[in-house]
From Swiss-Prot:
It comes from Citrobacter koseri (strain ATCC BAA-895 / CDC 4225-83 / SGSC4696). This is Recombination protein RecR. A zinc finger (C4-type) spans 57-72. Keywords: DNA damage, DNA recombination, DNA repair, Metal-binding, Zinc, Zinc-finger. SMART domains: TOPRIM. GO terms for molecular function: DNA binding; zinc ion binding. Residues 81-176 form the Toprim domain.
Length: 201
């Protein structure tokens, strides 16, 4: 079908987003052009600024437009002595929304995967080791994903922490709140049973 080259280019560009196929990209493009051109302009400006100005925090490697992000530069967070290791900046947002963690973070931007040629230095573990050696840390909380690669990465970091006398802990995995046991997979249920705790009154 003959169409505007710019429109085709817009739809192709939108397809770089996760989960966006040809139909979704077409719907987005037509919606912006037909109903919300001002919103499209705001999106374009925000995207241009974000792509050119957002980099990585020098301490934790999350996304920020500053040299050091707001979390790492917070004195109260620095005094906490805890670092939570996560695989992506999106994990920080998820944990921050709980309001249960008041320490700082370290973002791996992935996980160990020897089959894909991803080793310790590729996910910044050399920089994490520098922090273990130079900072007064009381605990490193390992919040990598509950996958084979995530577990292997957590175990590697735990061994690294032991070399520097820093306590390492792993976030609990188990039955989701509101879930039914019959719907939970065997691996998750095994983790739940192994990680059970006593009820105190």
């Amino acid at each position: 079908m003959q169409t505007s080259p710019l429109l085709t280019q817009l739809m192709e560009a939108l397809r770089c987003l996760p989960g966006v196929g040809p139909k979704s990209a077409q719907r987005m493009a037509f919606t912006l052009l037909q109903r919300d051109r001002s919103g499209g302009m705001r999106l374009a400006q925000a995207l241009t600024r974000a792509m050119s100005e957002i980099g990585h925090c020098a301490d934790c490697r999350t996304f920020t437009e500053q040299d050091v992000c707001n979390i790492c530069s917070n004195p109260r967070r620095q005094e906490n002595g805890q670092i939570c290791v996560v695989e992506s900046p999106a994990d920080i947002y998820a944990i921050e929304q709980t309001g249960q963690f008041s320490g700082r973070y370290f973002v791996l931007m992935g996980h160990l995967s020897p089959l894909d040629g991803i080793g310790p230095d590729d996910i910044g573990l050399d920089r994490l080791e520098q922090r273990l050696a130079s900072e007064q840390l009381s605990e490193v909380i390992l919040a990598t994903n509950p996958t084979v690669e995530g577990e292997a990465t957590a175990n590697y970091i735990a061994e690294l922490c032991a070399q520097y006398g820093v306590e390492a802990s792993r976030i609990a995995h188990g039955v989701p709140v509101g879930g039914e046991l019959e719907m939970v997979d065997g691996t998750t249920l095994s983790h739940s049973l192994a990680g059970r705790h006593k009820i105190r009154f």
